[in-house]
């Protein structure tokens, strides 16, 4: 085992770990990341985020790069296995107080690539 000092150890390098690494790097905090996978998983597990997350993306410097990879989400419909509507969740189409739309759709592997390249 190799002993190396760091201020923060991040276990997991998915979107949450990657955002945390980007935030901490802005404060010159030494981080080490442990991730069991060698490559980014090519299928999305998360597909939506809101204006608060976009504000965070702006603060870590990926807003403009990532905006090109998003779709403004005008709403979502949830259906059951028989295609019966369970929930119709329309989203406002106006900019929030944070300066962004309230709902975005995205492809998670694209986000992870941008977050990792930003470090």
Residue spans of the language-model regions?
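Residue-level preference for beta-strand/loop junctions
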Residues: 2-4, 25, 70
């Amino acid at each position: 085992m190799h002993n190396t000092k760091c201020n923060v150890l991040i276990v997991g390098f998915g979107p949450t770990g990657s955002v945390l690494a980007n935030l901490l790097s802005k404060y010159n905090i030494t981080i080490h990341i442990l991730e069991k996978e060698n490559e980014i998983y090519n299928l999305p597990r998360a597909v939506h985020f809101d204006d608060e997350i976009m504000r965070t993306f702006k603060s870590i410097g990926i807003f403009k790069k990532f905006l090109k990879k998003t779709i403004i989400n005008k709403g979502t419909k949830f259906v059951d296995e028989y295609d019966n509507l369970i929930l119709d969740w329309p989203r406002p189409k106006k900019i929030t107080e944070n300066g962004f739309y309230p709902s975005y759709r995205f492809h998670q592997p694209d986000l992870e690539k941008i977050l990792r390249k930003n470090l």
